[in-house]
């Protein structure tokens, strides 16, 4: 019985949450080339929709941010030159979205932006390792 419960828990942990699945679905594009503009537009609208409907917690949104950064890195390995600029503009757009939706909660905005800064630092390291 314990083995079944442990196995069930492990399976539950491995299945992506609904927001992560939605983020993945919303960012699917044809082929391997990803349009940065499309990613930014779809991502911003996804976050805004989920927050305005109360469907996603801050933690869910942070998971989607990380997923998007990973997907962008994965799909743009051959052309890393424009990634930094893309991420910078994408982060700015996301910051504007967060402030518009969470202006009542300064701490949440600060935490979100601190997370973004860490994500950019990690993303830069990833890009450097890809281009070597």
Task: Tell me what each language-model feature is.
Residues 2-8:
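Sec-dependent signal peptide recognition
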Residues 8-16:
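Bacterial N-terminal signal peptides
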Residues 15, 25-26, 38, 96, ...:
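Compositionally biased non-globular segments, especially hydrophobic aliphatic-rich helices
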Residues 32-35, 61, 68, 83-86, ...:
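Stable alpha-helical elements in mature extracytoplasmic
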Residues 41-44, 48, 73-77, 92-95, ...:
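Sec-exported extracytoplasmic/periplasmic mature domains
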Residues 68-110, 116:
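Long, amphipathic, charge-rich alpha-helical segments that form helical bundles/coiled-coils
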């Amino acid at each position: 019985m314990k083995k079944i419960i442990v196995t069930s828990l492990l399976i539950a942990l491995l299945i992506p949450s609904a927001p992560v699945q939605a983020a993945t679905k919303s960012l699917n594009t044809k082929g391997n080339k990803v349009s940065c503009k499309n990613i930014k537009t779809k991502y911003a609208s996804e976050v805004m929709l989920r927050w305005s409907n109360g469907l996603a917690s801050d933690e869910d949104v942070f998971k989607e941010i990380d997923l998007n950064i990973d997907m962008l890195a994965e799909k743009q390995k051959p052309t890393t030159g424009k990634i930094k600029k893309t991420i910078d503009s994408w982060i700015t757009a996301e910051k504007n979205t967060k402030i518009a939706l969470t202006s009542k909660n300064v701490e949440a905005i600060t935490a979100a932006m601190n997370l973004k800064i860490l994500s950019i630092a990690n993303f830069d390291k990833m890009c450097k390792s890809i281009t070597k």
